[in-house]
Structure formats: C-alpha cells, structure tokens
C-alpha cells in the first residue's frame, strides 16, 4: 500500500499541471501466442469515474499478448465457477468490484482466476481517490500481465515527449496509453532530448530558451528546475545513470563534441571521451558501468561502448554505414538504434550477445527510440502522412501502435521507469 500511495501522490501532483492535446492510439498486429483471458464488468463500476473493466480490456488488447473475451457481468465475485469460462475459450478470468467509500475514495478489488484449475491466481485491493481510479485499472492490468506472462506490465508507466505547433513547443507527460496528458514545460524555443530519472520524478532535457542549448533537470512534482550544463558551445543529449546520481551528456566546449559526466544535482562535470571525431548521444549501460555512444571516429556515425570512467572504446555496430541513437534495454541484453539503409532511417534492435539485428519499422524517417521498462516494447518518433507521430512496436515486431495528435508534430519520446 505504501508504494501505491507514493504512486498516487506523484501522479496527483502532476495532475495539477495543465492538460492539453490528447493522444490518439491506433493498434495493429497481434502477438504470436495470445493468451485468452475473459474480463467481466466490475460490480458497481458505474459508481466510479472510470469504467475499470474497459481500461483493463484496452490495456491487455493493446499489449498484443492477450485475446480478450467479454465475460459479461458477474455479480458475486466470491462464488465464481471459473472453470465454466474454459468452455468459452478462456484460460483466465478477471473479476472485480468497485465501492465508493464515505470519505469519497473508491475501494477497487479484483481477482484473477485460472479457468483450468478453477482457482485464484492473484488479487489486488486498492483505495483510490476519484482522479486515480484509472490508475487503479492500469495497476490491475499490470498484475494480470505479470501473472500470466511472467513479465512485469507497463500499463501504469508514463511517457514524455515534445509537441510542436508553429513556434510553440511543449514538453508533455502522459500515461503509457496516451491518456491523462499533462504539461511540464511550454516555450517559444525548441525543447529536445527529454530523459526520465530512474525514480520517475524528474526529467532532464535541452532547452533553447536562452537562445542556445542548455541542459536542465526539472522536478515534475515541484516544477523546480536545475541547470546541469550551460557551457560554451553545445550542451546536449542528457541521459541518467541507473542509480540516478549521474547524467551523461555531450558538450562541445573544447571544440569537437565529446562525452562528459555530470552530477545529477549539477556540477562535477568531467570529460570521459577523447577522440578527434564527434562523440555524442551517450547512454549508460543497464549496470551503469559502461557508456554507449555515437561517434564518427571511423569515418561515419557508428555506435561504440566504453567504460563509464572513460578509456578505450569498442565499436558495437558494423552493418550499415550510419547507425545512431543507441538505447539499451533494462536487462542490458538488447540495443535499439536508428540505421540508415537504402536512404531510409529505420528502427533496429540488436541482440548484444549474438550481434543479430532485426528491423522493426517499415517507415523511412524514424528517430529517438526508447525501451519500455520491461524491455518488451520500443517507443520512437516517426513520420506518418507527412506528419511527425509516435509509434510503439514490440521487440519481435509483431505488435505496433501509432500515437498522433490532432494538430502539429509530436516527437522526442522517452518511456518512463516503473513507478516505485
């Protein structure tokens, strides 16, 4: 309950920010082995501002991992013959209740039943203020996803991105499904390269509001901002260490852009790369011991890895003559990046152990990949119908989503961490 309260508190303070453009989500493709799961309408969910069962169904369908079956309404969740739903093709059954409390909060309870064993697999009881009943539904979907796949769900996580309409730039935060959009920063100058802190309470980004690129860290709860780098020349590409204590960045203060490390509270800037080329787009490895970055030291942009303390670098990408924007999965096993092949900039993912790569996009102008915290999906910017849009693809390439807004461009996405 303590963790859930922390999540509610963080989201609640964010909710005080101004909501603006709503994302629209389009889904295509399905997983290779979908799990059939029946979801019943929650008892008395009409009392809640959120139709809990609808959010759960949408989350599970959006993942591509489940075939959702409408179980109708089950009025007594303590006396359910789950086995009877096996005949309807379901391997599992989701049931629940919603009850409004005298203090105005909502008691949201759910059970996950095995139709094969006719037994309870999991349950979750939550007390949620009205504005967070939707978050409660996401947490239930996360629990269903984890119990049935063995992988932690990402429906209660958030994403950050930049929208542009004319000369108006907005750094926005939304739920992973594009709902509940909140404004973090608005500017008449470009905002680029947002990067979540590991605890999900801060975002580092580059703002041109001082008529030059400057790196800031903004607390999403208090909105307090700290300047991390305002050196001579370009200050760009901030990226957090896994423990949140350091930020890798790219600075050009001595000439060619090189990789540096700074304290996440500001100060302590020290150089860790030293090449005659351009070294940029640094990303910490999952264990924080290495830095992946883009360098043209071999004559064209390729992805390299070096110690987080600096030193010699090893080249990681060899296929294609233009590979940029490295991003590492949370388990450290996969590398996502953008590769130019036949004139197209497309999203690829590489198994770092085998070096085997897979193209995940059929578009021609992909940018800024970002792994979901469970490593099963990648969020990136692309171009659709001549407009900038966001897309999500599963790491096997089977499930795809596209997120658009009604007007303007949406770009520079980054997927937030699991909330603690």
Predicted regions and their residues:
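Amphipathic beta-strand/beta-sheet edge segments enriched in Tyr/Trp
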Residues: 23, 78-143
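Multi-bladed beta-propeller domains
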Residues: 175-190, 218-236, 262-280, 306-322, ...
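Hydrophobic beta-strand positions that form the internal "hydrophobic ladder"
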Residues: 159, 200-203, 244-248, 288-291, ...
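N-terminal signal peptide c-region/cleavage motif recognized by signal peptidases
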Residues: 16-18
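Short beta-strand->alpha-helix linker/helix-N-cap micro-motif
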Residues: 24-85, 94
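Structural motif
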Residues: 104-107, 167-172, 212-216, 256-260, ...
């Amino acid at each position: 309950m303590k963790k859930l309260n922390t999540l509610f508190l963080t989201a609640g303070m964010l909710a005080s920010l101004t909501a603006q453009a709503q994302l629209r989500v389009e889904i295509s493709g399905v997983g290779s082995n979908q799990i059939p799961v029946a979801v019943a309408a929650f008892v008395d969910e009409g009392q809640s501002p959120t139709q809990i069962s609808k959010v759960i169904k949408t989350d599970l369908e959006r993942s591509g991992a489940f075939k959702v079956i409408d179980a109708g309404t089950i009025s007594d969740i303590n006396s359910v013959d789950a086995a009877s739903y096996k005949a309807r093709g379901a391997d599992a059954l989701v049931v629940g209740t919603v009850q409004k409390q005298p203090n105005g909060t909502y008691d949201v309870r759910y059970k996950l039943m095995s139709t094969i064993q006719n037994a309870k697999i999991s349950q979750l009881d939550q007390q949620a203020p009205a504005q967070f009943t939707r978050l409660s539904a996401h947490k239930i979907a996360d629990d269903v996803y984890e119990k049935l796949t063995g992988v932690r769900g990402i429906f209660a996580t958030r994403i950050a991105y930049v929208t542009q309409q004319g000369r108006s730039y907005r750094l926005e935060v939304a739920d992973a499904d594009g709902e509940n959009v909140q404004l973090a920063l608005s500017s008449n100058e470009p905002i680029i390269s947002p990067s979540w802190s590991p605890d999900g309470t801060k975002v580092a980004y580059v703002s041109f509001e001082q008529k030059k690129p400057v790196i800031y860290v903004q607390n999403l709860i208090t909105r307090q901002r700290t300047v991390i780098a305002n050196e001579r020349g370009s200050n760009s590409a901030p990226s957090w260490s896994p423990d949140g204590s350091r930020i890798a960045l790219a600075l050009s203060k001595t000439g060619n852009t090189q990789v540096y490390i700074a304290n996440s509270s500001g100060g302590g800037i020290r150089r860790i790369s030293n090449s005659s080329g351009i070294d940029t787009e640094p990303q910490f490895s999952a264990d924080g011991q290495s830095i992946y970055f883009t360098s043209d030291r071999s004559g064209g942009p390729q992805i390299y890895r070096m110690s987080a303390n600096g030193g010699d670098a090893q080249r990681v990408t060899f296929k294609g003559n233009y590979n940029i924007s490295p991003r590492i999965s949370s388990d450290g096993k996969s590398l996502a990046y953008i590769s130019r092949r036949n004139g197209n900039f497309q999203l690829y993912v590489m198994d770092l152990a085998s070096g085997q790569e897979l193209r995940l996009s059929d578009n021609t102008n992909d940018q800024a990949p970002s792994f979901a915290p469970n490593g099963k999906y990648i969020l990136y910017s692309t171009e659709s119908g001549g407009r900038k849009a966001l897309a999500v693809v599963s790491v096997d390439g089977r499930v795809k989503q596209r997120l658009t807004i009604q007007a303007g461009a949406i770009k520079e996405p980054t997927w937030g961490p699991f909330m603690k």
